[in-house]
Design a protein with these regions (language model features):
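Mature soluble binding/inhibitory domains
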Residues: 1-181
Length: 181
């Protein structure tokens, strides 16, 4: 079933900034205003560092077509005919860590946002696949922030698979609680 591109709305909840202090470190600062979305107007500042789980890619800006790229698929991907969802791929060595942002199943246009993650490994066929996980944790403004405990906060909800045709095109398939997409 195609994703209904008109089934979402945006609410500006506040500013966000990232300041880098080097190639692998920085500071993330954001505020969520008290506008009925759960924010209380507090400002949160977090120290961030690059998450390295393989050989880091060498990235260079190019204005040219990426269709020839077959070695690194790190990017923010979406289907332009299904605006409202997307997937971020962080690609290092033979692993792609994916963060899928979409909406919970339901009827109508008021479904809650849903974030799922997958750590996918490259198979001998060139396909990347792995388990799809839903995590829960501390609120964005929790002080102190309680780190994620995978044994408590992570639930396997399905599987994810991505096969790239080239650097611009791929096919993503996944299932959530038995429902295939």
């Amino acid at each position: 079933t195609p994703f209904p591109g008109n089934a979402f709305s945006f609410v500006d909840v506040g500013p966000l900034s990232v300041t880098f202090s080097g190639d692998s470190a920085g500071t993330l600062t954001y505020s969520v205003q008290g506008d009925g979305t759960g924010g209380n107007g507090s400002t949160v500042t977090k120290t961030i560092s690059r998450q390295a789980f393989g050989t880091l890619p060498v990235c260079e800006f190019t204005g040219s077509d990426r269709s020839f790229a077959t070695q690194n698929f790190q990017d923010l991907w979406w289907n332009p005919t299904e605006s409202g969802w997307g997937i971020n791929f962080t690609h290092q060595s033979n692993t792609i860590f994916a963060t899928l942002f979409t909406f919970e199943p339901g009827v109508g246009n008021n479904n809650k946002g849903l974030w799922l993650t997958a750590s996918m490994t490259r198979q001998s066929t060139g396909v990347y696949s792995g388990q799809l996980v839903k995590v829960t944790g501390s609120a964005f403004d929790a002080v102190p922030f309680v780190p994620l405990n995978p044994a408590v906060n992570a639930t396997i909800v399905g599987n994810m698979r991505v096969e790239f045709t080239d650097g611009n095109t791929g096919t993503l398939t996944y299932d959530v609680n038995g429902q295939s997409v």
